[in-house]
Structure formats: C-alpha cells, structure tokens
Amino acid sequence: YYDLEELMTTWIEKSCTILIDESFLDFCDKPSAIKYLETYDKLYILKSMTKFYSSAGIRVGTIVSTKENIQKLKRFEPMWKLSQFDSNYLQAALDDKLFKNISKAINIKNKIELENILKNSTLVEEIFESSANYLLVKLANLNAKECQEKLKPYKIMVRDCSNFDYLDDRFVRIAVKSSSANETLKKALQEIC
C-alpha cells in the first residue's frame, strides 16, 4: 500500500490527471481517495465490483469524479450500460454489509493459510505483502512459465507477472481462494518438489 497523501500531494503539484483504481480496496481497511474530489477536479476513481464480490461474469463497476468530468465522459458511454440483472445485483451487493464482513474474515484466514503453504515450499524465494486477494511471489528455481506448466495437471492457474514493470520471469501472482484450493496447491507443491 502506498502513502496516498504523499502521492496525491506530488500529483496535484504537477497538475496531473489522476486515475485511481480502487477495485481491491474492499479487501483492506484503507481510505478511499474520494475525499480529494472536494479540492481537486482532475481525479477519477474507478471501482470494479467483480473483484471483491467474485462476480467475473457480471461487468459492474463505477467511476467517480466531479460532476463536470462525468458529464464529459457521458458522451462515450454505451446506450445500454446495465441490464436489469446487473442493476439488481449491484444494489443487493452494496446493501449486504454482512457479506462484506464475512468475506474479509474468510479472505484473511485463507491468505494466512496460503502464505504458510508458500513459505514451506522450496519453489518460493519470497512472498510480498498484499492487502488484496492475491499474493505476489518470487520463485526460487524456476520461471513463471515452468511453474504454470507444472501446476496445469492440478488445474491450478497462477498469473505470470513478467510483463509487469520491474518484475522478471520469476514472479507470479497467486489468488487467495478457498481452504480446499489451498490444500490442492499444497499437495501440488509437495509433489512437484
């Protein structure tokens, strides 16, 4: 997590147009950048509902900015933005506070479990701190493509991060999933090593 105050100060001083993606913000208890809209009008905040609510098939999200900025963006929006299903889903998801609390607790438990599995694997050199529902991992003695191939028979997918800035082919991103998915990964790593 970056120091948002520090970044915003720098960006505002340079009069940058700022787009902040808060799609993973629900996984942690960090503040939104929305408060900066009161004093800075070149800010856009994007939020996808598919991340926290595990609804990849439903393309629902929001963009928050000043009234003027939203009016400018409206000329580019599609005629049919949301289906009735999407709209109902969005409303139900936002109203369900219990889901949010339970999901956070389950994600934390499963992430700790996943971290412990990875720490005990000789394939892993380093695990980086994450507030989201995935872990960035540096592999010890194989590259991302080799790791993907070794995990394929177990139907486990990891994200090759070699095309991310400052990362090479030894970095993968592993999603935090269920406890049973963690057990499958643990078994796979034990058999691969």
Task: Locate the predicted segments by residue.
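PLP-dependent aminotransferase class I/II
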Residues: K42-N120, E125-I127
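PLP-dependent enzyme catalytic core of the Aspartate aminotransferase-like
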Residues: P153-Y154, D165-C193
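Conserved PLP-binding catalytic core of the aspartate aminotransferase-like
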Residues: I108, S121-Y154, V176
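Active-site pre-lysine segment of PLP-dependent enzymes
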Residues: Y1-I18, E22-F52
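Hydrophobic C-terminal alpha-helix "anchor/cap" residues
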Residues: L37, L118-K119, L151, L189
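Short acidic/glycine-enriched loop/turn segments that link adjacent beta-strands
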Residues: G57, S131-N133, Y166-D168
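A general structural detector for well-ordered alpha-helical segments in enzyme core domains, enriched
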Residues: D3-L7, A33, L114, C147, ...
